[in-house]
UniProtKB/Swiss-Prot annotation:
InterPro entries registered for this protein in UniProt: Glutathione-S-Trfase_C-like (IPR010987), Glutathione-S-Trfase_C_sf (IPR036282), Glutathione_S-Trfase_N (IPR004045), GST_C (IPR004046), GST_pi (IPR003082), GST_superfamily (IPR050213), Thioredoxin-like_sf (IPR036249)
Alphabetical keyword list: Cytoplasm, Mitochondrion, Nucleus, Transferase
Positions that bind glutathione: 7, 13, 38, 44, 51-52, 64-65
Subunit record text: Homodimer.
A biological process term (GO) from this entry: glutathione metabolic process
Listed name of the protein: Glutathione S-transferase P 1
Compartments it resides in: Cytoplasm; Mitochondrion; Nucleus
Amino acid sequence: PEYTIIYFNARGRCEAMRMLMADQGAQWKEEVVTSDDWQKGDLKKAAVYGQLPGFKDGDFTLYQSNAMLRLLARNHDLYGKNPREASLIDMVNDGVEDLRLKYLKMIYQNYENGKDDYVKALPTNLGHFERLLASNNEGKGFVVGAHISFADYNLVDLLHNHLVLAPDCLSGFPLLCAYVKRISSRPKLEAYLSSDAHKKRPINGNGKQQ
């Protein structure tokens, strides 16, 4: 396979990429980094910003997970049909990143004391995505346009994580609830999500996810 993910044993910031590649029928390798590997320092020095994940497309190496998603989107025609759609996809993905950062801050820095307040704020944060869905084909398809985009994979991955954290979090959002089920039931993606490669990989590196 031409693609390689360089990352710790976690879904983390790579699961949206894995979902995209699986759904698109792409093959990839995993270079799993242990904490001992990371502590040695060589991988950290090689990384542009001193952090993982890293990604290889043949002999081309890239860092920053959203840049990796965009590379895959360009490679697999998942970036809209025109510049306006591409800009809307970027806008949605930036919103996903905003919520992911809030989620990760709670998971890694304030899980015990911050989880309840985080879950209470979810209706506001998830409401943005419900309205975005409603504005495109009455919420019956994808978040932008008539075809799946990299932002769909990123959003569905983050929603999967939230359904583990707070299983009822989508109960007030019928469009998002149907959307997650619809995207997750695409045949190749469903096969991946049912596999041990997905199910046995922890969501977060510190084991805190519910």
